Every structure is written in structure tokens, then in C-alpha cells.
Swiss-Prot record:
This is UPF0046 protein T07D4.2. Residues 73-94 are annotated as: Disordered. Signal peptide: none annotated. Belongs to the UPF0046 family. It comes from the Eukaryota. Pfam families: Metallophos (PF00149). One of its GO terms (molecular function) is hydrolase activity. PANTHER family: CALCINEURIN-LIKE PHOSPHOESTERASE DOMAIN-CONTAINING PROTEIN (PTHR12905:SF0), METALLOPHOSPHOESTERASE (PTHR12905). InterPro entries: Calcineurin-like_PHP_ApaH, Metallo-depent_PP-like, UPF0046_metallophosphoest.
Length: 396
């Protein structure tokens, strides 16, 4: 019930037939030894451009550090972890409406694909040096509690984890993952939950609706594990002491804003499941326009969301939110293991960073990308890791 075999049953219920060959060409081979994004022309612009873009259209940054004439230590607060309350939420300039075929993502994509370009992204080599005036992001997701060789993770500044780092969110799984994070040399590790982090979803264990026997058994086992492992009321989220956990909120690191959210279309009554349509759109409406990096568990429709049977699993409202309103430079996600790879719509880079393939085997490489910053900004954030972590926890 709590073994990987259970998870494989759930995954196999959603995939069967092979992907058409022409659709496969939209993604890079999983067997390639390189998974680094080659910066496109617009990546050479300084991150200050995005900062100005946010200022001019309603800033989402509150009490944040910005490099200026004064030294960083004298320019106000050193970081900002900003819950998306009414005061900090940006008014929607381009409201996204529900797609008429949102319940059928494969059909919805057939209607949208002419106006939503998808192109493969050229990738950099794994041994590309980290530059002093760039922030290196390393993206992983969907490890499902599997042990992997941390020595094979490339160097970088920020680790992004796109959810599903456990098989079902058992406290000992979270503890082991947190212990692994503590061994990594990244200055910051930013984590979101996925549908398998059942103990992270406050509503998952409280559901009273009728469930299948295996689902009820899973919930009972989780409740028992939480009760036996709880120490002073500490939640599973609190066990991630070596990471910055985001759930519908944003943090600024190196002057770069990162927004994280775990929700995804409902499949088999797992954690952070919501019905397609208005329920999910309400969550996407919380994402501020102008964030630099969007970290979700689910893919948007059309990017890294195709299963082996040719069906699409992405969210149409998330795609339209990204394309029409938020416009991040990078959108990082996981969830659909068969969709591993990188694409672009000409502005946003979409990264499906699932480490496990559809058989839950760790076959895929991490994916990295760089964002240029001022060297002094990078140095400041590297030197003040503990202070910035402490400030974020206080904001939460």
C-alpha cells in the first residue's frame, strides 16, 4: 500500500499507448547526457529589467533588498517572503477566463495550439561553469523518495524542487529528504509539495467523501504515522528545516522573485487536488504578474504534459495565466514523468524536471538555467543565507 508498487498502479492507470513520433520531437531525449538550458537572447538582459517591469505595473516586492548606493547591509531588509494576502496581491490586468473545454485538456490543446507556440529549447552542457554575475538554478522534481547520488547533482546557487519528493508524505520520508537537503551545498533550496506529499495538504486527511479501499488504507496509515512521529505538534512541513517551503507565496532571492504553488488537476484523490476550472483558476489568480520564476507541480497545457497514450494532462487555465498575465521568465514543474524536457513559447522557458521516468526509475538528469545579476548582489545573498532564511520563516 505504501510501497512504490502502489504508486506505479496509480501512474499506469493514466498511461498505456505510445506517444506519436511527431509529438515526441517536441521534447529532448531522456537519454541525453545534457539537461542545461542554453540562454536565449533576452536572457542577456540584466535582472534589473524585471525589477523595473514590476515597479511600473504594481510592485509585488515589499521591504525587499535592492542594490543601490548604500551597501546591502544598510538598504532595509535582506529578503522578503510575502504571503499573498489582499494587500500584496496585484490586481489582474488581464483576467483569465475559463476555457470551454477545460475538462478535456487534449481537446482544449487542439483549439489553443495555433495561438500558443511550443518550441524545443537548446540546452547547455552539464559542466558549464557558474559565472560570478549569474545565479545558477538547478531544477529537480518527482524523485518519489528514491535514493539518488547527490554527487551527480551539478553545482549551483539555488535548488528548485517541483514536488513529489516522497512516495506519500510519511514523516520519515520527509525527514530523510530534509537530511539529504542538508548535505547539498546550494545556498538556497526552494521546495513545493506535489500530489504525493499527502501530509502537507491540510485538507487531504480530513476528507469525509467515499474513497476506494486503498485510499482509505493510505489515509489511515498516514494518520497513524503522523501520530507516532509527531513531536510537540510539529507538522510535516516543519520537518523541512533545510529548505524554503513555498505554498501559494513568493520569495525574493538575489533580486529574483520565485513563486511556488503545489496544486494540480484532480486525479485519484491525491494531495493538493482541485477540480479543473474555477477551483484551479482561483489558485492561479493568486500568482502575481511579473514574477521571474514560477514553480508549480502541474504543467501548463501543451508544455511537458503529454502521457504515453497521447493524452494531455496540463491545465488550460494555468497556460493562459502564464501566457496572458504572469509572463515569468521561467516556469518549472514536474508531475507528468513522460513530459521531461524543456520548451519555450518565445518568451517563457518551460521546464519539466521530473527525475523519475514513467516507471519510477531515476533516469533523468537535473535541468539548470542562469539568470544574470549584479556580482555584489550575488555575493550578499551568499554571505547572508542564515539571516535570509530566518527572515523568511518570520514572515511566514
Amino acid at each position: 500500500m505504501l510501497s512504490p508498487a502502489l504508486l506505479k498502479v496509480s501512474l499506469n492507470r493514466r498511461s498505456s499507448a505510445p506517444v506519436p513520433q511527431d509529438e515526441k520531437m517536441m521534447f529532448h531525449s531522456r537519454n541525453r547526457a545534457a539537461s542545461y538550458l542554453q540562454p536565449m537572447i533576452e536572457d542577456q538582459e540584466l535582472i534589473g529589467f524585471n525589477r523595473d517591469r514590476r515597479r511600473s505595473s504594481g510592485s509585488i516586492i515589499v521591504d525587499s533588498f535592492e542594490l543601490g548606493n548604500a551597501s546591502p547591509s544598510r538598504r532595509g531588509s535582506i529578503a522578503s517572503g510575502i504571503p499573498m494576502d489582499k494587500k500584496t496581491r496585484r490586481k489582474l490586468s488581464n483576467p483569465v477566463s475559463l476555457h470551454q473545454y477545460t475538462e478535456d485538456p487534449t481537446l482544449a490543446w487542439e483549439m489553443l495550439k495555433e495561438k500558443r507556440p511550443v518550441k524545443p529549447v537548446r540546452q547547455m552542457r552539464l559542466d558549464t561553469p557558474v559565472k560570478p554575475d549569474h545565479v545558477r538554478f538547478v531544477c529537480i522534481g518527482c524523485t518519489h523518495g528514491e535514493q539518488f547520488d547527490i554527487s551527480k547533482l551539478p553545482p549551483g546557487d539555488v535548488l528548485l524542487v517541483a514536488g513529489d519528493f516522497t512516495s506519500c508524505g510519511l514523516p520519515n520520508e520527509v525527514h530523510n529528504f530534509n537530511k539529504l537537503l542538508g548535505k547539498l551545498k546550494y545556498s538556497y533550496k526552494v521546495v513545493i509539495g506535489g500530489n504525493h506529499e499527502c501530509t502537507f495538504d491540510d485538507t487531504f486527511l480530513k476528507l469525509k467523501q467515499e474513497s476506494e479501499p486503498k485510499e482509505m488504507a493510505l489515509k489511515q496509515a498516514l494518520l497513524s504515522a503522523i501520530h507516532s512521529d509527531s513531536k510537540g505538534g510539529i507538522s510535516a512541513k516543519d520537518l523541512l528545516s533545510n529548505a524554503i517551503y513555498l505554498e501559494d507565496n513568493v520569495i525574493e532571492l538575489f533580486g529574483i522573485t520565485i513563486y511556488g504553488t503545489p496544486w494540480q488537476p484532480k486525479v485519484d484523490n491525491w494531495a493538493f487536488n482541485l477540480s479543473r476550472g474555477q477551483q484551479l483558476l482561483d489558485k492561479w489568480n493568486l500568482i502575481p504578474a511579473g514574477v521571474d520564476v514560477l514553480l508549480t507541480h502541474t504543467p501548463p497545457l501543451g508544455h511537458g504534459d503529454m502521457m504515453n497514450n497521447g493524452q494531455r494532462m496540463g491545465c488550460a487555465e494555468l497556460l493562459n495565466t502564464v501566457f496572458k498575465r504572469v509572463r515569468p521568465k521561467y516556469h518549472v514543474f514536474g508531475h507528468i514523468h513522460e513530459g521531461y524536457g524543456c520548451t519555450t513559447d518565445g518568451y517563457t522557458k518551460f521546464i519539466n524536471c521530473c527525475m523519475c521516468n514513467e516507471n519510477l526509475d531515476l533516469k533523468n538528469e537535473p535541468v539548470i538555467f542562469d539568470i544574470p545579476v549584479h556580482p555584489h548582489t550575488k555575493q550578499f545573498y551568499i554571505q547572508n543565507v542564515k539571516k535570509i532564511h530566518k527572515r523568511f520563516q518570520k514572515k511566514k
